[in-house]
Amino acid sequence: MSAPSAVRPTRIRLRPWQSEALERFANCRRPDFLAVATPGAGKTTFALTAATQDLADNPGRRLVVVAPTEHLKHQWSRAALRFGLHLDPQWSSRDGALPSDMHGIVTTFQQVATSSQALAGLSRDAFVIFDEIHHAADDRAWGTAVLRAFEGAAKRLSLSGTPFRSDTSAIPFVEYHLDEARADFEYGYGEALADRGVVRPVYFPRINGFMEWVAPDGEVLAATFDDELGRERANQRLRTALSLDGQWLPVVLDQAHGRLVELRRHHPSAAGLVIAMDQAHAQDIAGVLRERHGVQAVVATSDDPDASAKIAAFTASDDPWIVAVRMVSEGVDLPRLRIAVFATMTTTELFFRQAVGRVVRWTPGLHGPGARTQPAWFFLPDDPRLRRYSAELAESRRHSLRKRQGSEEDPLAADPDDVADALGDDPFGDDEQMSLFSVIGAVAIDADATTAEVGAAAAHGLGVFDDDPDDPGVGREPDGVEVVLLPPPLPGGGHVDLAHAVVGDPASDPVSSMTQRERKTRLRDLNADIAAELVRSTGWGYVQVQNELNRLTGIRRVSEATLVQLEARLDHGRSWLRRAG
């Protein structure tokens, strides 16, 4: 059994916006607070700092984090560990009471819909964090369940990477003005760029094309992205460009890979992301990268049970490419991404900003050409909808740079973006007989010129989201405010055992980087092995053995046991096995 040890403080240097947001949060008398901050700015650090301070002021209070996806649950749990917070990312309403050595849990909006009653009890007087709160509107039942599950919470901190609207039903715990969510604190992309060292400037090579296709009604059509089309035909044009039956996408992948090769000369771990339409499309794109460039791309899709493991392995590697489908909007945390290719039919502004957010995260410690600004490139079809979204972000980028450079003229000011009328923000609706749709061909137009133009822009140092749990940012904010946080007391009394809480170097000490849940999983597996051996040695039934081990340890069930109790249960099992032998 591990001996208790002193509590070690966590030192964090907050960015100026985080410090300001924390002060505003502390002065907010209402239970609800909405913070909107651009992806990569450090929303997770802000939220966990706020939670740590609140739990320290309110001993016994639990913390509940609601994340968009299963993958993000584990990222939040690991990020919380840096603050001395133990959160269970595998909580289930069937587990019984939460063990007293856990500060709380991480769940998903989807899980809330099926476990709202259990969560209502767990979250009473709790501190609740909603990561990307707009996901509560993904399903009408989710919003209702969120309200039912968390209306008894003491504090509710909602996070979002971009301002959002509610055109159908209001999201619980969010105030609105003219259908627009009213943020209590907002930190935009332009502000983050102006602050330097927070996010990267992103450049948007927009590739035109000439597409030919047979529409579902049998009509043969041809158009470039400059031609004005209605929504239905525009979607068909985009689908044609993205199809690998044509040459538009392979040429764009060539351009993106060439840019990545250049980047990796000075940033060897830099990587690229392709956002695909579906699983088959993702596999085909990986095939193109393999055949044309000799690289083995990682494919991660939401329906792949091994997707999280693949992403974790890719994050720790220096592999050049990953191809994803919906997981890009679900918080894929890959800080080394510098290149992206938008090859999906999802054309809503929210999804676009989420996708751009995958390449904006600043990487400290880079050296060599481009290290001062760390530009990223996001390759796009020159679809008018995407053109408009990218132009708005580009204007934020240029505005922040003009502020930074005073009266100096922007070298690209004479080359304005062509902003066409949007074709609508609705997601692509497959309400056609798409089985009758077929691609004749697609070719890229002026791809070389577009990429060269954007490369020249970056050479001048100029430039343009669901967030991920991020690094607490120790020692990288020269203008920030340093805070010292002690791990808050556990709900069951006492403080975090340092022997179980310290996060060390995973390479030299893998155990020290494990979360409390991961340690417990190992101990549960060892307990299960001992129980199986006892069944063979004693002739007792499996349930009898388990119940006796629980009795000896003084627990009702394994899922309610603390880490110390699981260690004690294992010791009882080993002693019993020695006697039985």
Per-range role (PLM):
Residues 29-50, 275:
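Walker A/P-loop
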Residues 9, 168-269:
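Interdomain helical connector at the RecA1-RecA2 junction of SF1/SF2 helicase-like NTPases
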Residues 44-54, 59-82, 277-280:
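Conserved Walker A/P-loop ATP-binding site and its immediately adjacent core
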Residues 2-36:
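Conserved pre-motif I regulatory segment
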Residues 242-244, 248-255, 259, 380-533, ...:
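Long, largely alpha-helical accessory region at the distal end of helicase-like NTP-driven motors
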Residues 70-93, 288, 292:
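Conserved helix-turn-beta segment of the N-terminal RecA-like "Helicase ATP-binding" lobe
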Residues 119-158, 162-164:
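SF2 helicase catalytic motif II
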Residues 296-408:
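Conserved RecA-like P-loop NTPase helicase motor core
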